């Protein structure tokens, strides 16, 4: 079971993802879920591939998936300016059946974003009304450290259901539901019935507020530093737990990193900047001097040359 998915064209979507690595595929839907953004924001969209490793009763299943992440951010900010950027993955899906297994749901979904350099973190929050097809624990954003523990000095922003994930957290499991869940609906993102029985969903956008530093650029990225850049690591930026029925309940904990395939060591563009916010140069104060040449004395009412 858990055979690699086969992509199938559909009228409403550009690509179809299959179980057991459902969260990292790209899906563009015409007119879907336009999100309000701050004035003067520049929209950056980055497409990239991820290599995913899904555990199963037959051993690890490897799959390459397509991804899309959008960032709405100001093109430039002033030194010391408080600003907000918005980041969100595209919609994706999982099938009704795959290789004899009947899917049940996905849960313990997680996306990790790196906190950018050259700015001071202020806050991060889920944007209400930007997710589709989720239930169980409401998505939230936690600042965590490399071990996945909540830490006010951590360098990672974790989108999850209260840190209930499959690994790299104090609240982990690979054989029980938890956190953000995607129940089977067999519906598209717009609520219409999907002809193939696929269940479409979308994780919410996150607004990140920061204060710009003195110089340089600010570049939002997914988490890839250290072990997060390894193939099939619990620290990977995107992880989730698939549940299916095949001779009993089966679980497929899945871990995805931005690389072209399982045999590729270097990370791809997905590990690079998803947007670039320039910090404008501070104005330079130039001292000026005005010299006046006048006679030492003058008669009242007389012109002075």
Segments and roles (model prediction):
Residues 1-41:
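Secretory targeting and sorting signals
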Residues 98-102, 121-123, 228-270:
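Beta-sandwich strand segments
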Residues 51, 157, 201-203, 208-213, ...:
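Generic detection of short hydrophobic beta-strand segments and adjacent strand-loop junctions
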Residues 2, 6-7, 42-149, 171, ...:
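Serine/threonine-rich, low-complexity linker/repeat segments that form flexible spacers/stalks
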Residues 128-152, 226-251:
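Internal, charge-rich low-complexity segments
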Residues 202-242:
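Internal, hydrophobic beta-strand segments that form the core of beta-sheet-rich folds
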Residues 161-218:
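Low-complexity, intrinsically disordered segments enriched in Ser/Thr together with acidic residues
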């Amino acid at each position: 079971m858990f055979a690699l998915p086969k992509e199938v064209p559909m009228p409403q979507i550009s690509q179809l993802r299959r179980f057991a690595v459902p969260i990292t595929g790209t899906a563009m839907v015409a007119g879907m879920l336009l999100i309000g953004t701050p004035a003067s924001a520049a929209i950056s969209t980055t497409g990239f591939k991820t290599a995913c490793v899904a555990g199963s009763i037959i051993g690890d299943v490897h799959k390459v998936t397509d991804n899309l992440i959008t960032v709405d951010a100001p093109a430039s900010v002033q030194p010391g300016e408080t600003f907000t950027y918005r980041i969100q993955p595209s919609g994706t899906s999982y099938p009704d059946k795959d290789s004899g297994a009947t899917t049940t749901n996905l849960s313990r979904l997680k996306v990790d974003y790196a906190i950018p350099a050259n700015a001071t973190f202020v806050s991060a929050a889920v944007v209400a009304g930007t997710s589709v097809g989720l239930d169980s624990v409401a998505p939230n954003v936690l600042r965590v450290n490399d071990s996945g523990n909540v830490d006010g000095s951590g360098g990672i922003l974790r989108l999850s259901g209260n840190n209930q994930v499959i690994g790299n957290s104090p609240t982990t499991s690979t054989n029980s539901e938890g956190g953000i869940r995607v129940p089977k609906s067999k519906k598209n993102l717009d609520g219409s019935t999907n002809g193939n029985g696929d269940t479409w969903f979308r994780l919410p956008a996150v607004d990140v507020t920061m204060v710009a530093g003195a110089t340089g650029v600010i570049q939002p990225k997914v988490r890839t530093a250290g072990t997060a850049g390894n193939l099939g690591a619990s620290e990977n930026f995107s992880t989730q737990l698939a549940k299916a029925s095949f001779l009993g309940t089966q679980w497929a904990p899945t871990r995805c990193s931005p690389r072209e395939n399982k045999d590729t060591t270097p990370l791809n563009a997905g590990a690079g900047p998803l947007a670039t916010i320039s910090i404008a140069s501070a104005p330079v104060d130039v001292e000026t001097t005005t010299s006046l040449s006048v006679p030492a004395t003058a008669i009242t009412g007389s012109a002075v040359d």
